[in-house]
């Protein structure tokens, strides 16, 4: 703690590491991360609510993208792994 301000110094703490996604993991889309992304600017703004509520299942992982299957009769989608979080 800094003596002058009484705040915790975060520079000494280790960086937060996001759990690496694996095939079969249950996930959902993080609304805040997705809405601030380049992909959201290029896509329809009226997204279905179920992608934010989850769960979706990771089917494949290629580079920075994951193929996600939702538990609904809809096509599988490829999402940037930065935009999805564990359910």
Curated annotation (Swiss-Prot):
<protein>
    <recommendedName>
        <fullName>NAD(P)H-quinone oxidoreductase subunit O</fullName>
        <ecNumber>7.1.1.-</ecNumber>
    </recommendedName>
</protein>
<keyword id="KW-1278">Translocase</keyword>
<keyword id="KW-0813">Transport</keyword>
<keyword id="KW-0874">Quinone</keyword>
<dbReference type="GO" id="GO:0016655">
    <property type="term" value="F:oxidoreductase activity, acting on NAD(P)H, quinone or similar compound as acceptor"/>
</dbReference>
<feature type="region of interest" description="Disordered">
    <location>
        <begin position="1"/>
        <end position="26"/>
    </location>
</feature>
<comment type="function">
    <text>NDH-1 shuttles electrons from an unknown electron donor, via FMN and iron-sulfur (Fe-S) centers, to quinones in the respiratory and/or the photosynthetic chain. The immediate electron acceptor for the enzyme in this species is believed to be plastoquinone. Couples the redox reaction to proton translocation, and thus conserves the redox energy in a proton gradient. Cyanobacterial NDH-1 also plays a role in inorganic carbon-concentration.</text>
</comment>
<keyword id="KW-0793">Thylakoid</keyword>
<comment type="subunit">
    <text>NDH-1 can be composed of about 15 different subunits; different subcomplexes with different compositions have been identified which probably have different functions.</text>
</comment>
<dbReference type="Pfam" id="PF11910">
    <property type="entry name" value="NdhO"/>
</dbReference>
<keyword id="KW-0618">Plastoquinone</keyword>
<comment type="similarity">
    <text>Belongs to the complex I NdhO subunit family.</text>
</comment>
<keyword id="KW-0520">NAD</keyword>
<keyword id="KW-0521">NADP</keyword>
<dbReference type="GO" id="GO:0031676">
    <property type="term" value="C:plasma membrane-derived thylakoid membrane"/>
</dbReference>
<dbReference type="InterPro" id="IPR020905">
    <property type="entry name" value="NdhO"/>
</dbReference>
<keyword id="KW-0472">Membrane</keyword>
<feature type="compositionally biased region" description="Basic and acidic residues">
    <location>
        <begin position="1"/>
        <end position="10"/>
    </location>
</feature>
<dbReference type="GO" id="GO:0048038">
    <property type="term" value="F:quinone binding"/>
</dbReference>
């Amino acid at each position: 703690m800094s003596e002058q301000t009484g705040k915790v110094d975060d520079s000494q703490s280790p960086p937060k590491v996001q759990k690496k996604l694996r095939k079969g993991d249950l996930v959902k889309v993080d609304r805040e991360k997705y809405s601030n992304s380049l992909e959201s600017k290029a896509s329809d703004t009226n997204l279905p609510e179920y992608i934010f509520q989850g769960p979706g299942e990771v089917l494949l992982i290629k580079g920075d993208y994951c193929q996600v299957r939702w538990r609904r009769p809809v096509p599988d989608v490829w999402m940037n792994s930065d935009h999805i979080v564990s359910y």
